[in-house]
Amino acid sequence: MKNTMKALNLHAVGDLRYEDVPMPVRQAGEVLLKVHACGICGSDLPRVFTKGTYHFPTIPGHEFAGEIVEADDPSLVGRRAAVFPLLPCRKCEACQVGEYAQCSDYDYYGSRRDGAFAEYIAVKEWNLVFFDDSLSYEEAAMCEPAAVALHAIGQASVGIGDTVAVFGAGPIGIMLGLWARTAGACRVILCDIDPTKVEFARKQGFDAVNSRETDPVEYIRTQTGGRGADACIEGAGVAQTWEQALKAVKSFGTVVSMGNPAGDMTLTQKGYWEILRKQLTLKGTWNSSYNDVRNEWRTALAAIASHRIDVRPLISHRFPLSEADKAFGVMRERKEFFNKVMFINR
């Protein structure tokens, strides 16, 4: 095994370098994974360009899959795996009941420790989610956002015959729509201000609204006979869309906050009245469940493998690590349509 590898190493905010770094040193209970595919999450943009990671230098990247090349157990070598990126302490109160996303002292691949914008990564065996060669590495790398979307649908308590409105039609928004269908929703309405995303959503068979041209609240009310959606999921992290979700949901309905805001958000008095008068249920959603009782990663991977959740159309751009400037440029400049942008190691 060589002593160095190529990686995208974040030395400071805005200072992401494609360079040689030491090969990861595998500890007991870890495997060395050759990264074959790693998606760029929307959260990676502020992580790289505005907010930074928890320390420098750090290799970002938390949506990934690869092949095990070293392990304590020789039978694991050669197996394929996606990776749950959260490393819980396994000691706190939340961890004791399997709610690892609520861990009070967690670590995380790609933000608190080195991630997968690299040729190799050392990961805990506990975090591995195995898959066979009927599934591509690219599809398996979509397991992380798929599991996050599945968790949000669970928070929204989507049921058979429901109408679900999703504000934000990016990769997560599309997967929210796919999971809502799987949960039995009879109508899924996606809302976005980007006409290319609206058109893409329509090509996936969704009812989609361009919020710049059509008032999404009025549209949702019209489509539901004035009743409103059973559940609204706000995935943009914007005050305006959150308030639209409050107005578009039915009385006694559920609004789930999912989008990460870029700054403070202000709720108007009218929006607050919507909560009071309609007696709404407000929920947050964070990460995904990864325990013996409810493992959303295994559910997501099985759904992706069967193409019940078909993630293949969502992968719009593929780049080698050496073309990171181009990859991030697609997402930052927004001059062309993109959905999931992914780094591929051949």
Predicted regions and their residues:
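NAD(P)H dinucleotide-binding glycine-rich loop of Rossmann-like/cofactor-binding domains
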Residues: 87-167
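Glycine-rich cofactor phosphate-binding loops and adjacent beta1-alpha1 units
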Residues: 156, 199, 204-280
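Mid-domain Rossmann-like dinucleotide-binding core that forms the NAD(H)/NADP(H) cofactor-binding site
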Residues: 135-214, 218
